[in-house]
Curated annotation (Swiss-Prot), chain B:
Originating organism: Homo sapiens
InterPro entries: CATSPERB (IPR028748), CATSPERB_2nd (IPR048788), CATSPERB_C (IPR048789), CATSPERB_head (IPR053903), CATSPERB_Ig-like (IPR053904), CATSPERB_N (IPR048786)
Positions of disulphide bridges: C35-C60, C189-C302, C330-C343, C718-C816, C829-C1037, C911-C920, C922-C937
Entry keywords, A to Z: Cell membrane, Cell projection, Cilium, Developmental protein, Differentiation, Disulfide bond, Flagellum, Glycoprotein, Membrane, Spermatogenesis, Transmembrane, Transmembrane helix
Gene that encodes it: CATSPERB
Stretches assigned to the Cytoplasmic side: 1077-1116
Any single GO CC term annotated in Swiss-Prot or TrEMBL for this entry: sperm principal piece
Membrane topology recorded in Swiss-Prot or TrEMBL: Single-pass membrane protein
Localization of this protein: Cell projection, Cilium, Flagellum membrane
UniProt-recorded name of the protein: Cation channel sperm-associated auxiliary subunit beta
Membrane-crossing segments per the record: 1054-1076
């Protein structure tokens, strides 16, 4: 006895007949599929002779699922369906339709110009993660069975609303037909199933797996490919008489064996001569129903996967489908046509796997695990460049048994780890507790791989960490492997801040109140270029100073070589002073600053990039970042050093490059960390500085000024020597007398004038001196 | 000099990777890896790796049912980021190496490539321990751990020689009909290296041996030699009937006893091109007949990293009564085995009928000699221990003589279990001494069978005894229990334990091993099915509690006295399992011997694990009746109820046992008639008399033997796990320096629930030499009732030596892999312990190579010394007086060699007698070594600016456990190697150190400094080369460290610049001041001078004028 059936029949008490509106969808006359929403438990889609869409796990009678006639589908045959977030994508009549079940609205996706039969994608259920949204939004649409060299593959990063043509590298050279294309996030690769002469193999898009195909496997019939939820890279490929399984996103595909106890009865489904009708998969379980009316069950462990047969019961019909309700609880679902109502009822049969496994005839060993848990499950972690992560799991085996815990990552090309397993105290009933410490960092930094094993360090990837027990019995239904998602990429909490210890406000040069009061300043036309090309502009620029954004500017004395002190902050805590390479750009296009080093003095081996070329290449400023930065010290960079005298515009890193200002005033800089090996994040910010202390522009050359000063000093010394001598002579005496007279006369005039001024009081006092001085010459 | 440092750092790096101890005796760990050095590894083979001069390359794959599955597993692991790791360990070293992750499309095997230097630096030939390798998936988790060995073929002494003519195997097989016995001797450090010798009859003569480097696992790893010519060449005259009698391979020598004398090889560590030569040891008066009966005795110990107190001894005994002309029939010698001296001290000579010496062994831990004497007349054996003084046994015995009981009538020999202090005396009994021969305890009694050979494995602590009749018994070192494992049918055979403790049976032309190829299953039994250890009699069970049962062994009254033992429980049954022919089993906990009750002379107390099957009515009809019991003299009469017709006593009921709950049990001995039977009571005190027991209140058990024995005794499965923390090896060697201590921890875990908890210790600890170290043990039961023992050993006396420590799980089954752990503690200096000077400024190694490391001021902190540099002496920069050259190059001229004294001094060391620097063969290590011995090689030294004040001399000690700063009581003396002065040391002297200093300084005749807070000031220039030495008496180690300092930019030795500058300034200032003062005072010296000149001129002119006048006048 497997289970007891019950029928779901609701809403049929009142004689209210609902009409089926729109075109009734159908899938295939003889087989069924049941697609559960990977993240939301109660949402599922049943595909068969009828299509049903439920949001309550088939707990109500349902009308067949239809597509509005306004969508004008030809043949309403569904060939493929996929949940992308809150959207249901359906391929109907070789076109992709979108059903937004939250708003109950239909639309047709844009951009697909050629017929497609299938959509594929993955879902990530870690809510609140930007990364997960991105995963759910990536969808491929393709025509299964088409020759790869000429087929059109589309991808969408908008959850299926709009598609673009997907360019697979050297697609035209691949011989074989397309068995499917998938984005395996567990491996950070796009993989294409190439079918050729009865063999299938996966071809991957990126280094290091792109050099060769995965191992080939027998491809009989047209295999449906199921990606098991949880991003662990588990794939199930199945057809009527073939059931294949892959641990590692298709790199190795193996048959699922049929076992009894410890004994392998058949090494494949084909050998077992059974015809699969429907299968259901969770993160670590597998159930198969066959036309022969048998139910098989297996778990997706580390050891070669296998299924065991349960006792027989008549459960099979053409419409039957399987789904897992929760771990260890399988539901066998059959839609029942109701002659009186258009709404279908559902016969449900709930199978308690754990109870069935107790049957001694199955020869299933006792589960050796009492407890397995880790604080990291259902959480997502980030490892940024050079950062590390430590996770722990605890494990309690049955007394007197020993377990073999295995820690694995889905993408060892980017994520490496080391695990230690040790005794850690006892439970209250005297059972030994074990602890597993897992220490993770980027694989490239472990140094335990061949050089061509690791993926590019620059590229952000992701990986799943799984802790499972190698010698786990099939009876460990409730013991799920522990798994978590680890993104080897940007830690979004990271930001950069420019150290502002000496600001113009704190030194009293600028007043913060003035700055906050809609302050603006003028950049003279000689000093800026809105095109960032260093050309003079035709008019002065009024710039509004955003105190909100920039705060009080950093004070920089004009005569010093300067570079900013860039600090890395994570959330609200200071981490370190960044020593990586970065670039600066004045956002208003001011060019009255230069760099202390040239390409040659910076010891460049190739032509360094600079803002002019970057702006030209990327069509605008602020596009210089870690993605496109190429170091001129990179031995792999083979751009010849043609102009060694150009300014070296990269600061930080190993060079001592600094900025020289040529002009007083405000500068608002955009800073971008371009070192690709500092962080996976695009670290950038804007800050302002105030340069002071520069002389006004010189009109006369310094030599002339010095000459004048020296000659005037010499002159006055000569005068000081000569005057007393001259005064002693007769002529001198005369002049003296004359001067005294003049003085006296002046005095009188002055007194007169002064009184006059006192009366008038309008004339500026400065004017007096000129006639006075002029007259003294006489 | 520098190489140990690198070795240490590699070692330290690796040590920290181990985090938890390994649990032994867990049976479910599958051995999954197959690895090899070369080619595709063979499945189901013990991993045997060999280290040559080149890199160690290892290929491994994962064994599964078939090849495809094993590839699939490799890909599953690789795609999960898992690759195995390789642990290499011996008693003092362990290192972890990781197999690299490789795309599995590239390779189907795991591969690791380890440079030899990463494992060991040395390449000299010496006794080196064979490494144990452990390959595990998922480093640290001990998953699928598979063990193997790694042998350093380059350094293993015996493998460097050809001890005779190499002959093919076919030629050896021709000998087989004439071989009478086989002898095996193995290398004490690497048990996989072994020699197999053939003892031949008189028809063929010669010495034939085979040398294996792979533990006789394969035919190809054995090379055969004919040593006949080598032996004959040592004999002056032609002799005949040469045959091997016995041989011993010690750490450095091969000792061969032949029918023509005892031959000792040359030192195996120094191979010359010619083949191995032997020298003959002369024993006056001994001839062929004596040699043929001779025996060699050797205490097998590994002397890797040998210390001065570690010496091999070999004893030879001859089976012959001492005549007056001969000094003894027992001789022993220590390395190099040139001088053989009698075992018996002179004083014994006076005694008339002195027993013969069967065995004489030297106990190296205690420095004693242990004798096993046998008096042929009285048939008694005694053991005696004498202290060795100057390698001669003291005439006074150390302990009272131990007299074995007369039942030990035919002793054969005595042997120390290798690397431990367990002493076994064997013959028709086996006796164990854990205290070096003071007392012995009986382990086994074989009555008329005699143990002839013993075989030992240091790794698993397994011991196999083989008796005259070919019966094989096994035990573990130090255990009080043993079991029979079968018998050998071959006439000529020998056994051999390889390095991993796999037992091999070597017969003529056929080597059998006990290990795989039976893959993941248990090891194969070489001796047939495990035998039943039961004996031919009936047992009478007696319940004492619900789960405790006593079995009494029945001895019939008419049993002859000589064979009574065969109807009794013996030592062998201790810790075994009694199985009933029906169901049920019980673990034997205790063996009891007694004289009452009559008929039961022995019994065992057993713990019932599974209830025993009762007799049913259809088997014994009597059960359907009630039972009346009456005492009838010594026996009891059992009477059935006559009313019950079908209830009858039958013949088959004899030897069945009537069990009455609450009363004594009765073993039916005879049937009187259908209704009456005679029985004997197991416990007469609680036997009922004249009582009737109703049907179903009495039971019948059948443990009889009349119709085939219904009970059997087998070994018990392993019942304890053993966990040893901190070290992955069972035979660790730990060095304890003066004032240091070491803590060892072990844990015994019961591996099944519902096990009877014992209040008594599960683990016993024996110390080989309790006088050497202060050893204290602390034991606790933890929360899971696991037994935790913490042993701390601390240095005690200023005496070097080594002692073994033994942990024995005495209640563990002999089936356990580990029952005994024997760590060795050495009160000595570890070869890994060294002192280092920490430079005040760290300069990375790359910068040392480039020679440029600038500080923030742009001052280069590295000075490349001029070629053939010698530091200056007190006599001046240009007059070096030291013998040490730096950066030597004999092809280049020697600077500063102007003076006679300089020419006289200065000697090349590394570069002596060569013409160019290349020929000096300076290694990288030597170039960067601070040691004065390598001064020729030294090119670059750390550079400092003049003057150096308060340069901190920080020193640290590096040992196995990490680094510790040097501090008191490690006081140091400091010298300048080139006898330079102009330097001064400053240090803090607290009160306690002051006293020590005062005490030590007069003895040493040198200044002693406190190493903490030591400061150096240098007033001189150029190179200073200091040597810091730790004073003796505080450590066993010779801790010396040297460091160099080059002082640059010193001012000129003559302060000319300053003087001139000062003088000029003073003069100028003075002049100006004078001028100023003159000006002030209105003195105008110039004008005065001018005036004076003018006046003079006037004067002169006047004089001249007057003169002229005068002259003219006179002319006139």
């Amino acid at each position: 006895q497997l289970c007891r059936s019950r029928t779901v029949r609701t809403g049929k008490v009142f004689n209210l007949i609902q009409d089926v509106q729109g075109d009734r969808l159908y899938f295939h006359p003889t087989t069924t599929r049941l697609i559960k929403h990977p993240c939301e438990k109660n949402i599922a889609l049943y595909l068969g002779k009828q299509v049903f869409f439920t949001m309550d796990n088939f707990e109500t009678s349902l009308l067949p699922f239809t597509i509005p006639t306004s969508m004008q589908v030809g043949v309403p045959e569904v060939t493929s369906a996929h949940f992308a977030g809150s959207l249901l994508l359906l391929v109907v009549d070789q076109k992709v339709y979108i059903y937004d079940y939250e708003n109950n609205s239909w639309s047709m996706s844009l951009g697909i110009k050629h017929p497609v039969t299938h959509v594929s994608g993955d879902n990530c259920c870690y809510t609140g993660s930007l990364f997960c949204v991105h995963v759910s939004n990536l969808v491929f649409a393709y025509f299964r069975g088409d020759q790869i060299s000429q087929t059109y593959i589309y991808y969408s990063n908008t959850g299926g609303f709009s598609f673009w043509k997907y360019h697979y590298d050297r697609q035209a050279e691949i011989i074989g037909s397309l068995g499917g294309i998938f984005h395996f996030f567990s491996l950070s690769q796009v993989a294409m199933l190439v079918v050729n002469q009865g063999k299938g193999m996966f071809k991957y898009s990126d280094h290091p797996l792109n050099r060769s195909f995965g191992l080939s496997f027998d491809y009989n019939g047209t295999l449906d490919i199921l990606i098991a939820p949880g991003q662990r890279g588990i794939l199930l490929l199945w057809f009527e008489n073939s059931l294949l399984f892959s641990h590692n996103a298709g790199q190795l595909v193996d048959t699922v064996r049929v076992k009894k106890g410890d004994q392998t009865l058949f090494s494949s489904i084909f050998e077992a001569k059974i015809t699969i009708h429907n299968i259901a998969v969770t993160e670590n379980e597998l159930a198969v129903i066959t036309r022969e009316d048998n139910l098989y069950y297996g778990n997706l462990g580390i050891v070669p996967s296998s299924i065991i047969k349960f006792a027989d019961q008549y459960i099979w019909s053409e419409d039957v489908a399987l789904m897992f309700r929760s771990p260890g609880t399988l539901e066998i679902l059959t839609p029942l046509r109701d002659t009186a109502f258009p709404a279908f009822d559902f016969q449900k049969c709930l199978v308690n796997i754990q109870a069935l496994l107790m049957d001694p005839e199955l020869h299933v060993g006792k589960c050796k695990i009492e407890f397995l848990t880790g604080e990291f499950i259902y959480r997502m972690y980030t490892i940024d460049m050079h950062s590390q992560l430590e996770l722990t799991a605890s494990l309690i085996p049955q007394p007197g048994t020993s377990l073999i815990p295995l820690v694995m990552v889905s993408n060892p090309h980017s994520l490496g780890f080391q695990a230690t397993f040790y005794e850690n105290g006892y439970t209250s009933d005297g059972n030994t507790k074990y602890k597993l410490d897992i220490f993770l960092k980027q694989q490239q930094h472990w140094g335990r791989t061949d050089s061509n094993f690791t993926s590019s360090l620059k590229k952000a990837t992701m990986s799943t960490l799984t802790v499972d027990i190698a010698n786990k019995e099939i009876s460990c239904v409730d013991i799920k492997p522990l798994s978590t998602l680890i993104s080897v990429g940007c830690d979004l909490d990271k930001k950069i801040v420019i150290q502002n210890k000496v600001s113009a406000c704190s030194m009293g040069i600028l007043d913060p109140l003035t700055l906050q009061d809609n302050y603006s300043f003028i950049i003279e036309k000689e000093f800026y270029d809105p095109g960032f090309q260093g050309q003079q502009s035709s008019e002065d620029l009024h710039v509004f100073y955003s105190y909100q954004q920039l705060g009080c500017p950093l004070l920089v004395y004009y005569d010093t070589l300067w570079k900013p002190v860039v600090e890395l902050w994570r959330k609200d805590s200071f981490q370190e002073v960044i020593d990586a390479e970065y670039v600066l750009l004045e956002v208003n296009g001011q060019f009255s600053y230069s760099y202390s080093l040239t390409a040659q003095s910076a010891m460049c081996t190739s032509q360094p990039q600079n803002w002019t070329t970057m702006i030209k290449e990327f069509g605008g400023p602020f596009f210089w970042n870690r993605e496109n930065y190429v170091s001129c010290h990179d031995p792999n960079n083979n751009a010849p050093l043609r102009w060694p005298d150009v300014q070296y515009q990269i600061l930080g890193g190993r060079t001592a490059n600094q900025i020289i200002f040529g002009h007083n005033g405000f500068y608002v800089f955009y800073i971008s960390i371009v070192d690709p090996y500092y962080s996976y994040c695009q670290l950038e910010t804007i800050f302002s500085i105030y340069v002071y202390g520069a002389f006004p522009v010189q009109l006369v050359s310094a030599g002339v000024v010095i000459l004048l000063i020296i000659s005037s000093i010499l002159g006055s010394v000569w005068l000081a020597y000569k005057t007393p001598k001259l005064l002693r002579t007769a002529r001198g005496r005369r002049i003296k007398k004359c001067a005294t007279q003049l003085c006296r006369r002046c005095k009188t005039v002055c007194q007169f004038r002064a009184s006059a001024t006192a009366r008038a009081g309008t004339e500026p006092p400065g004017r007096h001196r000129t006639p006075h001085g002029g007259r003294s010459d006489h | 000099m520098e190489s140990p440092l690198i070795y240490v750092s590699v070692l330290l790096l690796n040590i920290f990777e181990f985090s938890s101890g390994i649990v032994y005796n867990k049976d479910d760990t599958e051995k999954r890896f197959a690895c090899s050095n070369k080619g595709f590894p063979q499945e189901n083979e013990i991993i045997k790796l060999y280290l040559f001069l080149e890199n160690l390359k290892i290929q491994c794959f994962f064994q599964t049912e078939n090849e495809i599955a094993s590839k699939a597993m490799l890909s599953v692991f690789t795609s999960g980021g898992l690759a195995p790791s390789l642990g290499i360990m011996n008693s003092t070293y362990n290192g972890i190496f990781h197999f690299n992750l490789t795309l599995f499309s590239d390779r189907i095997l795991w591969l690791v490539d380890i440079p030899r230097e990463n494992i060991t630096q040395s390449t000299d030939i010496a006794a080196v321990e064979e490494w144990l390798v452990r390959i595990t998936l998922h480093h640290g988790l001990n998953i699928y751990a598979t063990e193997g060995t790694l042998l350093d073929v380059i350094r293993e002494p015996i493998l460097q020689w050809t001890p005779g003519d190499v002959i093919p195997e076919s030629e050896i097989s021709k000998l087989y009909p004439h071989v009478v016995d086989l002898k095996v001797t193995k290398c004490p450090c690497a048990n996989d290296v072994a020699l197999l010798g053939f003892i031949v009859d008189t028809i063929v003569d010669g010495v034939y041996i085979g040398i294996t480097f792979g533990g006789f696992w394969h035919d190809y790893d054995t090379t055969w030699f004919n040593m006949t010519q080598t032996i004959y060449s040592q004999l002056q005259e032609e002799y005949e009937d040469l045959s091997l009698v016995d041989m011993v391979l010690t750490n450095h020598f091969l000792v061969i006893l032949t029918s023509l004398g005892l031959f000792v090889s040359e030192d195996l560590r120094y191979p010359s091109r010619h083949s191995l030569s032997f020298s003959r040891a002369d024993f006056c008066g001994f001839e062929r007949v004596d040699y043929v009966k001779g025996k060699l005795w050797y205490n097998e110990r590994c002397f890797a990293n040998r210390e001065h107190f570690e010496v091999d001894y070999v004893t030879v005994t001859f089976e012959r009564n001492r005549t007056l002309s001969e000094s003894s029939s027992c001789f022993y010698s220590q390395e190099p085995f040139l001088e053989w001296v009698p075992c018996l001290p002179h004083i014994f000579k006076g005694i008339k009928i002195f027993p013969t010496v069967l065995t004489f062994l030297v106990d190296q831990e205690r420095g004693t000699g242990v004798y096993l004497f046998y008096n042929k007349v009285r048939k008694t054996a005694i053991a005696s221990v004498s202290t060795l003084r100057n390698n001669e046994p003291n005439s006074q015995s150390k302990f009272p003589i131990f007299r074995f009981p007369s039942s030990f009538s035919s002793p054969v020999g005595m042997v120390f279990h290798p690397r431990s202090h367990f002493l076994y005396a064997y013959g028709n009994q086996i006796w164990l001494s854990v205290d070096g021969g003071n007392t012995f305890q009986l382990i086994a009694n074989f009555h008329d069978d005699i143990i002839k050979k013993t075989f030992h494995s240091f790794y698993t602590s397994a011991i196999t005894f083989v008796s005259q009749r070919g019966k094989v018994y096994s035990t573990k070192a130090g255990m009080g229990r043993y079991s029979a494992v079968g018998s050998v049918t071959e006439r000529i055979f020998t056994l051999y334990y390889d390095h991993l403790g796999f037992l091999h049976k070597l017969t003529l032309g056929r080597f059998e091993a006990s290990g795989p190829p039976t893959a993941f299953g248990n090891s194969r039994n070489l001796f047939g099915q495990p035998p039943d250890m039961g004996f031919e009699t009936a047992l009478a069970p007696q319940h004492t509690s619900l789960d405790e049962i006593i079995f009494f062994a029945y001895v019939p009254e008419n049993e002859p006295q000589e064979t009574i033992y065969s109807k009794k429980f013996g030592n062998i049954h201790y810790g075994k399992v009694i199985h009933s022919g029906k169901t049920g089993r019980a673990y034997i906990r205790k063996v009891l011997q007694h004289t009452t009750p009559k008929g039961f002379l022995s019994s065992v107390i057993a713990e019932m694990k599974e209830p025993f099957g009762l007799e049913e009515v259809n088997e014994s009809s009597c059960l359907s009746s009630s039972l009346l019991i009456n005492k009838a003299g010594n026996v009891y009469k059992l009477t059935l109820d006559s009313q019950v017709v079908q209830a009858l006593f039958e013949d088959t009921d004899i030897e069945k046992t009537v069990v009455l709950p609450g009363y004594s049990s009765f073993l039916i001995t005879s049937i009187l008639d259908n209704k009456n039977a005679l029985a004997i009571a197991t416990m007469p005190e609680s036997a009922p008399n004249n009582m009737t027991f109703l049907k179903s209140t009495w039971f019948l058990y059948n443990f009889g033997q009349r119709n085939g024995r219904t009970w059997k005794i087998y070994s018990k499965p392993c019942n304890y796990w053993f966990q040893h923390d901190d070290s992955p090896s069972l035979n660790i060697v730990k060095y304890i320096d003066l004032g240091n201590s070491y803590v060892l921890k072990a844990k015994v875990i019961r591996n099944a629930k519902g096990f009877r908890m014992l209040e008594i210790p599960l683990l016993t600890v024996f110390v080989g030499n309790p006088n050497l170290l202060e050893v204290t043990a602390e034991v606790t039961f933890d929360d899971t009732d696991s037994y935790v023992i913490t042993i701390s050993a601390a240095s005690k006396v200023l005496h070097q030596g080594s002692t073994s420590l033994a942990f024995i799980m005495w209640s563990a089954s002999t089936e356990c892999f580990v029952t005994t752990m024997v760590p060795t503690l050495k009160s000595s200096c570890s070869y890994l312990r060294s002192m280092h000077h920490i430079p005040s400024k760290f300069i990375p190694f790359e910068d040392w190579i480039s020679g440029v490391h600038k500080d923030s001021q742009g001052f280069n902190l590295i000075k490349t010394l001029p070629i053939n540099y010698r530091p200056p002496s007190n006599m001046g920069i240009a007059i070096p007086l030291t013998d040490n050259f730096y950066h030597a190059d004999p092809s280049k001229p020697i600077p500063r060699n102007m003076f006679h004294m300089s020419k006289k001094t200065g000697k090349f060391k590394q570069c002596a007698n060569v013409s160019t620097r290349e020929e000096c063969n300076c290694t990288k290590d030597q170039k960067f070594s601070h040691a004065v011995a390598f001064s020729d090689c030294r090119e670059k030294v750390p550079r400092f600016k003049f003057p150096i004040t308060q340069y901190p001399v920080s020193l640290e000690i590096i040992n196995e456990d990490g680094r510790v700063p040097l501090q008191s009581p490690y006081l140091v003396t400091v010298t300048e190697v080139n006898m330079r002065h102009n330097w001064k040391l400053k240090h803090t002297v607290p009160e306690n150190i002051k006293r020590m200093k005062q005490l030590v300084e007069p003895i040493l005749g040198a200044a002693v400094y406190n190493p903490s807070g030591l400061n150096l000031s240098i007033k001189g220039s150029e190179l200073f080369h200091f040597r810091v030495t730790v004073i003796s008496g505080v450590t066993f180690c010779n801790l010396i460290e040297e460091f160099q300092i080059y002082v640059d930019e010193a001012p000129l030795p003559f302060p000319g610049h300053t003087l001139i500058a000062v003088a000029t300034a003073v003069v100028l200032g003075g002049l100006i001041f004078i001028a100023f003062m003159f000006q002030l005072q209105g003195i105008h010296p110039w004008r005065t001078f001018q005036r004076w000149i003018r006046r003079n001129q006037e004067k002169f002119s006047s004089i001249s004028l007057s003169e002229l006048i005068h002259r003219s006048k006179s002319e006139e």
